[in-house]
């Protein structure tokens, strides 16, 4: 709480609306803070001795940590300290189902997380269907929704996001794919879809990049861990092809096929119909060409990888070799209205995962590369926290993404999931004094028992000035279901945050 004489501002604020309303009418309405600092008696401010005390008090509040004036309204905070700052923390795959080994509790309920619980006590909680009830989200569609974009309207495939996040400058007509380094045995059966979660893949990527085929240019790049991206560039190629990833072990990689069927009838004589059929035939021809290119590329990559010194050494150590590439998620670059243009706030992304960085980059947000951020359970969270605080100086909205909980969920590792939750909680106290609003949620559930994404809703908490608090005292899936926020969709989260920040626009007259 504010200390006297700072608390006098609450009884003397009746002088301020006159000044603020007049300042708002100026062309440079966002420069309120500069006007307060440079002008001891701002234009229109009442000529009363008490006014100077209010001004002095406002300056004292601006110099104080943000947590000390959390009881004030959002609009007043904006007036006193400048632009409102929001931090959205996304713990990838953090939500879970109850586990018998944990006395039918979830990892989030077992984890020691005093900071998340503190946010729940002073904020509003709820549960969220990132896409829709009963729909298990991919990480790509989930992050589109969490940034306020409708994935049903904007999603064109995972590949473009992976490529953009890997630093590849995509051109019109490029087709991008997500790739997994995987392990196959001598019978071409997939024994590990992630090649033992291999991390050092740069040498492998360099070898694969040397593959040349007629018909298209291949751009291959490793991203984080077992992940990579592949871009096809050239004429007459298509994203309308199937995946080679069987999405489970014990099966052979799938043959990539065109998704368009061969037309069985001859072209009709009617010009309009014939034109449509000819276009379909052309699309099908391009898809067939692309499928053949990808199958040939996969075969050549397998021959290169199984003989590579890195994999020979892994076999000697008893580790699964990264001797095959599973290709999936082909797509073209989507058109996204820039985040700042759409919502009126300047956004920044602090993440290691190429997918998340790519979504944010294509949305026009600033993307920060953090040394030590691995996109795994061993990521350097303190380095990420430092990057968040640095970017808060120049951005209104920061998205902090942490991948580790999802990885632990896919591996069925209860201990690792609890540990990463506790590590994320430990850095939250670094943000309390630098952000007005702090939001914590997950992009989807990755239950230990399923080892994959499910449609279970995820918990969300929003804490900050002016938020209607509820009776929830802890942060978990079970507790959040009783919260005042109710049950929302992923694409509703940003509009709710924007409204709390005082930047929403009225719908209607």
Role assignments for model-derived ranges:
Residues 1-2, 7-14, 37-39, 48, ...:
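Short, positively charged low-complexity motifs
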Residues 10, 18, 31, 69-70, ...:
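Short, positively charged and aromatic/hydrophobic N-terminal segments
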Residues 13, 19-22, 38, 44-46, ...:
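Extended rod-forming repeat segments used as scaffolds/tethers
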Residues 24-28:
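Polybasic, lysine-rich low-complexity intrinsically disordered segments
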